[in-house]
C-alpha cells in the first residue's frame, strides 16, 4: 500500500467511548494495586500491542484487549482535548 499526499479520514465507532473510559479506569486501578506504574504500563501496551504489559489481575488484560489500540488512543486524545477546553 502506497502513501499519498491526500488527507485520509479516520473514523471510529463512537458507541464504545464510555466503555473504553471505564475499562481504562479499571485497568489503571488493577495495575496500581499490583504495584506497577499504571501510566507506563498502559503506554507500553498501547504502543506495542503486547498484552504482557497488563496483568491478568482482576481480568485487566482481557478487559483492555476487548478494544483495538486505535480506539483506546482515540478516547485518550478526546479526553485530553476536552480537559483542555476544546469543544468537541
UniProtKB/Swiss-Prot annotation:
It comes from the Bacteria. InterPro entries: IreB. Pfam families: IreB. HAMAP family: UPF0297. Belongs to the UPF0297 family. This is UPF0297 protein SSA_2241. It comes from Streptococcus sanguinis (strain SK36). The lineage of its organism: Bacteria, Bacillati, Bacillota, Bacilli, Lactobacillales.
Amino acid at each position: 500500500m502506497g502513501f499519498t499526499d491526500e488527507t485520509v479520514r479516520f473514523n471510529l465507532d463512537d458507541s464504545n467511548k464510555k466503555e473504553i473510559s471505564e475499562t481504562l479506569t479499571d485497568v489503571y486501578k488493577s495495575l496500581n494495586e499490583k504495584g506497577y506504574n499504571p501510566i507506563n504500563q498502559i503506554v507500553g501496551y498501547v504502543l506495542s500491542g503486547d498484552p504482557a504489559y497488563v496483568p491478568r489481575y482482576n481480568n485487566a488484560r482481557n478487559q483492555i484487549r476487548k478494544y483495538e489500540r486505535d480506539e483506546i488512543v482515540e478516547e485518550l486524545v478526546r479526553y485530553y482535548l476536552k480537559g483542555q477546553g476544546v469543544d468537541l
